[in-house]
């Protein structure tokens, strides 16, 4: 029984250390100063939600619900280490430098979305109005899920 306990403790320690090293590897080179992702959803003639969501390189989240959103005001929170690594992995895989910066159709009422990515000190800005470019969909969904849809964020100042 003592041997089983020792094996379990050793296995747990190995898992903990390996997850720490994978998080460290994932975040390699990423700092709050050189990495952030912001998604801004603009107005239309109707009741389109108007908001912005930002995630910094240290996992800090800020959501600003402006109009026609479930929550108006500025909300803050933080990503878990694993969620932050998920975002960093998406950024690494997105081939950001080779994406077109604009995909705007001539539709007057279509709200403009803007994704601004600062990744390892390089700045990328993308705008679209009639459908997210395929290469950016996973990043957009991640930002929406963790800012606009994130009910665990708290109202700033509370």
What are these model-predicted stretches?
Residues 1-20:
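Sec-dependent bacterial lipoprotein signal peptides
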Residues 4-5, 20-45, 51, 69, ...:
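Short, well-ordered, aromatic-rich surface patches in folded extracellular/luminal domains
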Residues 14-16, 59, 86-87:
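Short hydrophobic/aromatic-rich motifs at helix boundaries and adjacent loops
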Residues 54-82:
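N-terminal, post-signal-peptide region of Sec/Tat-exported proteins
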């Amino acid at each position: 029984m003592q041997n089983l306990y020792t094996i379990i403790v050793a296995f747990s320690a190995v898992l903990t250390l390996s997850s720490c090293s994978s998080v460290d590897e994932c975040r390699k080179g990423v700092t709050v100063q050189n990495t952030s992702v912001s998604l801004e959803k603009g107005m239309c003639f109707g009741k389109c939600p108007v908001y912005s969501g930002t995630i910094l390189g240290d996992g800090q989240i800020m959501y600003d619900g402006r109009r026609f959103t479930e929550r108006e005001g500025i909300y803050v929170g933080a990503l878990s280490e694993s969620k932050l690594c998920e975002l960093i992995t998406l950024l690494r895989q997105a081939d950001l430098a080779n994406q077109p910066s604009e995909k705007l159709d001539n539709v007057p009422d279509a709200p403009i979305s803007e994704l601004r990515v600062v990744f390892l000190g390089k700045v990328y800005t993308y705008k679209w109005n009639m459908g997210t470019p395929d290469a950016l969909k996973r990043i957009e969904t991640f930002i929406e899920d963790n800012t606009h849809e994130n009910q665990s964020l708290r109202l700033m100042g509370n």
